[in-house]
Amino acid sequence: MKTTSASPILLLRAVGICFLAAIGAAQNVGPLEPPLPQARPPRAPQPRYRSMISIFDLRDRSIRTIYQADTVFEAPNWSPDGKYLLTNSGGRLFRISVNGPGNAAPEAVDIDSSLRLNNDHAPSPDGKMIAFSASSPASRGSQVYLANEDGSNVHVMVKETPSYFHGWSPDGKYLAYVYQHPAANGTPANYDIFRIPAAGGQPEQLDSNPGYDDGPDYSPDGKWIYFNSDRSGSWDVWRIPADGAGPGDEKAEQVTSDEWEDWFPHPSPDSKWLLFLSFAKGVATHNDKLPGTQLRMMPMPGARLAKPPKIQVLTTFFGGQGSINVNSWSPDSRRFAYVVYEPLPAAAAQ
């Protein structure tokens, strides 16, 4: 195909027309509008639950609900005199009568209102004091506190955050708690078990395994601390001597090792039973409330562990976080308290 060249006059004329058209277009364009702000995606609706504070009776395997509310109540403790439960809701601590007609109004414990309590709390063995975990505007993280039984004389026992109380020694001399070491030098954050004298003093670290350890609770004879850990690759119940696991945690002993994820072991006051919360295999944390959660029980281990332990299922329910985080046995070891949850229609976040 033969090509021809355009004349110089035609080219100049075409360039001029394009230039004039560009100027006219520019004159007709107004100022640039700022981009519209991107709308925030709507927040997910917040879960809501009905709480049923329940009592399980070992004698006949009956379950009685003593209080129900369409809000979250957590972690009931039985008072040493057997008359009431301590439970938390909305950052406050409450007493609920055990022997009332049912659904008696909770009575608030008058603790410093600037503190926001969580679900780790318990009365002392003599009933004169309450240990609890709470955050303050200054701390912005959970610390361990001690107060008189009526809520007065509040003072911080463990300033480091986050730290969570879990159990009294049976003689009332020590508080067992967990503290999260911050991540450092490539080592991830990690929870370990500590104790501190109830009269005040220096905390003592009781284990050193890099696993996540939680929920320490004393045996009634004061010789052992039972807790849950993922150090075996799944969540199981373990125990260590009350004065520590020794170098390399050489004295730590694994108590459970089946297909369930076990949390928050609680020895009965008569030393006959060990109660704990169990999630289905693969549930990574205790932070959720889930269907199919179980409360299981086994005979209290002796000096030597029986393998495998004889574990029985007491109840299967909708529960988890808040159901039984701290010891909730009755003083006579015949009953224990726990919280059953029922999902409610979700409310949109404000």
What are these regions (language model features)?
Residues 2-15:
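Bacterial N-terminal signal peptides that target proteins for export
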Residues 13-23:
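Bacterial N-terminal signal peptides
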Residues 27-350:
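Sequence signature of WD/YWTD-type beta-propeller architectures
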